[in-house]
């Protein structure tokens, strides 16, 4: 095969989610590790459901994550190629028109299941005469076009699942063109993957049967099939199915919640593999450490909450320059940006938390004072050092309070922290105190 070429082929019928990302990321990393090509292919053959706003959103999500494509292809611009392939299959006797309604097909399936047989299309349409077909067209309109499978075993070595063998006799002849003329994914993908030189296809394990039929379609058209690898499907933390429509798992929603790209990518690049999840600092590290053969077939549990500790750890390592715009957007004056970030970085989960910490510094907090500590806090506030507060102020203040009240340890420090910040835990007080602009109002 030629240079490694992979593709991510979303349908622009909604926003992409973490399941889509897993597929996109694997294909991206394979291409980049091999020095190959990564194609973004928009599977927009369904004109009713495909929307340009979703195309834009897909590109925005991938760009946010740094999954930059080498070129974009659109299936809606390639309909002539699909028609050529369909004509070739017809000429070979591998394409036939079928007219059953959904209700009729459902009744056939139920009958087969009741008889203990697999629910496979019975190929009744192959027995129709030309006259019968004309009558059905007049009555029902154009039929669907099915690919006639060779009823033999279809075998390949999967990059994740290993050796696969599927009996084509247990699979229905796939519909490749609908009655309204719309070309379906199974045929369009075969033509595209060949024309675009795709060498490796990584997708979910729910596509295994689809892959088997596509291998036969490719062979019928004289195409060499690419290498296939089918990753496990994601489930929720309790093993429940994930829904594409579960909004909190859409990438755009994760972005709005403050999840950092490298936190998300670091998790998805290892989830379901035999390697532990490791937070990476950049894409180059992800590429270097990726190995598709390390992934397994078992369903993979995904918990969105795992993203937030990773995001926090990623942010802690960033210099001020990397977050200067975010710090400024939180309202922090430029001259306080450096000490503020030094304080906040250890105490945030996402950048969305910056505004809350600055509000504390700017406006103060509602004091948290136990009844038995009220007199102590009043006395302590009167001992606050004169002049601007700096890194030494906390030590000087607590020493003065200790000498005046006799308190020490937790009995000294905790009431002061709660009175100043309204919280039982948080940043080092020596770091936070110089940033507190209204603390003297408590005296």
Curated annotation (Swiss-Prot):
Keyword set includes ATP-binding: yes
Motif ('HIGH' region): 10-20
Motif ('KMSKS' region): 241-245
Protein's UniProt keywords contain Aminoacyl-tRNA synthetase: yes
GO MF term list: ATP binding; glutamate-tRNA ligase activity; tRNA binding; zinc ion binding
Enzyme class: ligase
Disulfide bonds: none
Chemical reaction(s) catalysed: tRNA(Glu) + L-glutamate + ATP = L-glutamyl-tRNA(Glu) + AMP + diphosphate
Keyword vocabulary terms for this entry: Aminoacyl-tRNA synthetase, ATP-binding, Cytoplasm, Ligase, Nucleotide-binding, Protein biosynthesis
Predominant location: cytoplasm
CDD domains reported for this sequence: GluRS_core (cd00808)
Subcellular location: Cytoplasm
GO annotation, biological process: glutamyl-tRNA aminoacylation
E.C. code: 6.1.1.17
Residues involved in ATP binding: 244
GO cellular component entries: cytosol
InterPro entries in alphabetical order: aa-tRNA-synth_I_codon-bd_sub2 (IPR020751), aa-tRNA-synth_I_CS (IPR001412), aa_tRNA-synth_I_cd-bd_sf (IPR008925), Glu-tRNA-ligase_bac/mito (IPR004527), Glu/Gln-tRNA-synth (IPR000924), Glu/Gln-tRNA-synth_Ib_cat-dom (IPR020058), GluQ/Sye (IPR049940), GluRS_core (IPR033910)
NCBIfam families per the UniProt record, alphabetical: gltX_bact
HAMAP family: Glu_tRNA_synth_type1 (MF_00022)
Record text on subunit structure and interactions: Monomer.
Family classification: Belongs to the class-I aminoacyl-tRNA synthetase family. Glutamate--tRNA ligase type 1 subfamily.
Function: Catalyzes the attachment of glutamate to tRNA(Glu) in a two-step reaction: glutamate is first activated by ATP to form Glu-AMP and then transferred to the acceptor end of tRNA(Glu).
PANTHER family: GLUTAMATE--TRNA LIGASE, GLUTAMATE--TRNA LIGASE, MITOCHONDRIAL-RELATED
Protein name (record): Glutamate--tRNA ligase 1
Organism: Ruegeria pomeroyi (strain ATCC 700808 / DSM 15171 / DSS-3)
